[in-house]
Amino acid sequence: MRIRVPATTANLGPGFDSCGLALTLYLTLDIGAEADSWYIEHNIGGGIPHDETNVIIETALNLAPNLTPHHLVMTCDIPPARGLGSSSAAVVAGIELANTLAELNLSKEEKVRIAAEIEGHPDNVAPAVLGNWVVGAKLDGEDFYVRHLFPDCALIAFIPKAELLTSESRGVLPDTLPFKEAVQASSIANVMIAAILRNDMTLAGEMMERDLWHEKYRSQLVPHLAQIRDVAKNQGAYAACLSGAGPTVLVFAPRNLANKLQTSLQTLEIDADVLLLDVEGSGAEVFR
């Protein structure tokens, strides 16, 4: 059996800790034979465990402690610590592993709830489970979210080779915002969401680049954001914004501009991968 979980981008600018979008990069987990102990084969490196301390196995065992150990093989296109939901993908893969082997028959809603409990909020985990675009909130321990189709457009991901830990990126954020600024930040997010619902990527893109919640604070850690925005704007893109906590920057553009933008971004003197992606519509899947 095979489990496949997509990457995700969170925030989309002003949709801070609320908006998430599934992307066509994947964590894939092949479930092999039963074994005496858990072992997860991978070539990711970076100190990621091969035993039951791996997040995937740990998550599965928290849900189903009596699971029979298996040999697992993980391949992952999602680079860690780049703002593309790698930790959320691992958590969701663990939930799917337990659900499959223990025949828990969890609903998608239950999977989102469990994953959001582990991750703290649903902005990455909900699209990883459900696919497409999700707007969510965690209030008094309860998850509220809406899944909707995202407008058709090209997505160009500028993924620096250097990592940026979420903890470091969150560390530069203020504890509070002045009331007047928070009202303005909220109104910007509201217009962005309404524009997306109306398939108006021109207006949505304008709002994406006017975030007041987090990007101006994180820009000191991601100096290439301004460069990418200049390139994107000059070539007719809708917007460029941080993917999650960064350092990845995601460019939204008309499809006919995708290849030109990719080529232009590849010429920047920053060590990075520049990938053409799409919205992933299905979310986590199990292939038997």
Curated annotation (Swiss-Prot):
SUPFAM superfamilies: GHMP Kinase, C-terminal domain, Ribosomal protein S5 domain 2-like. GO terms for cellular component: cytoplasm. Belongs to the GHMP kinase family. Homoserine kinase subfamily. Its EC number is 2.7.1.39. NCBIfam families: thrB. Keywords: Amino-acid biosynthesis, ATP-binding, Cytoplasm, Kinase, Nucleotide-binding, Threonine biosynthesis, Transferase. GO terms for biological process: threonine biosynthetic process. It comes from Listeria monocytogenes serovar 1/2a (strain ATCC BAA-679 / EGD-e). It is an enzyme of class 2 (transferase). ATP binds at residues 79-89. One of its GO terms (molecular function) is homoserine kinase activity. InterPro entries: GHMP_kinase_C_dom, GHMP_kinase_C_sf, GHMP_kinase_N_dom, GHMP_knse_ATP-bd_CS, Homoserine_kinase, Ribosomal_Su5_D2-typ_SF, Ribsml_uS5_D2-typ_fold_subgr. The keyword Transferase applies. It catalyses: L-homoserine + ATP = O-phospho-L-homoserine + ADP + H(+). This is Homoserine kinase. Its main location: cytoplasm. Pfam families: GHMP_kinases_C, GHMP_kinases_N. Catalyzes the ATP-dependent phosphorylation of L-homoserine to L-homoserine phosphate. It is found in: Cytoplasm. Pathway: Amino-acid biosynthesis; L-threonine biosynthesis; L-threonine from L-aspartate: step 4/5.
